[in-house]
Amino acid sequence: MATSIAASSTATNVFASTPQFTRPTFLMCPPEWYGVDYVLNPWMAGNVHRSSRDLAFAQWKGMHNVLRSVADVRLLHPEPGCPDMVFVAHSALIHNGVAALSSFNPQQRRAETAYLRRWLISQGFLLWETPRETPFEGEGDVAFNDDGNALWAAHGVRTCRAAHRHVADAWHVPVTSLHLSDPRFYHLDTCFTPLAGGYILYYPGAFDAASNAAIEHAYPANRRIAVSEHDATHMACCALNLGRTVFTGEITRELATRLFDAGFDVVQLELSEFIKGGGGAKSLALRLSDLPVTHARLGLLPVS
């Protein structure tokens, strides 16, 4: 079921003392302790203790080097006992200097929030805490549209629908709730990513009928890039977008052509070790800069 929620009037005020970025800026966390040590999602099933930390680090370094060539990349120190900390985008949602911290439902990931909280405080971000009883998993389940003036949020697996109101209060923006109906797509970022220029990259099979109707209402047909099940199960939608460039894992030639025809350059990354843990390119980098700054660096696509 898809619903729209208007933010309440108790939105956080953004002060001039919060961090200001003039370049696209992201936070990444090296996979020093990464491993598939338990099962929290269907991707982990069958891969417990089958991931290679050396290969994961090489793949992470490849993405880090590529991203660093077009953006500033800050690093969060990895902590022992937090093998999923590399998926740093799940730990918060950031916009206008305000960081809405996650409230992880899985016990195995709860310690990550404290480490990110400490880093964000040191950098001057305002914190928007999430109640313990309100599961919310940051960029994993909530995404701004490309203008940064509205939110899309998922529920049904890891984030509860009540968290959507909480997120709306942080920035005083409307939120459209989407229901995830396929357990393989346990996070919104595995099946839905707004792109610059008013485009959406998504897998319709991950959502119920009402949610697909909401997406189709918001995005005209010529702005919807619906992916195949094959591409979806290779984390094609878990993509990082900077202006005219889309960073993603390995995708089919057909999808790459469709993105190119829409005006995007595609950078394909080898991220197989992270797919074993249920993540892709977007999961590995938490956006710190505001969307206008993030997209302007590589050119914002005009909407025609």
Residue ranges of predicted features:
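The feature marks the mature, well-folded catalytic cores of soluble enzymes
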Residues: 2-304
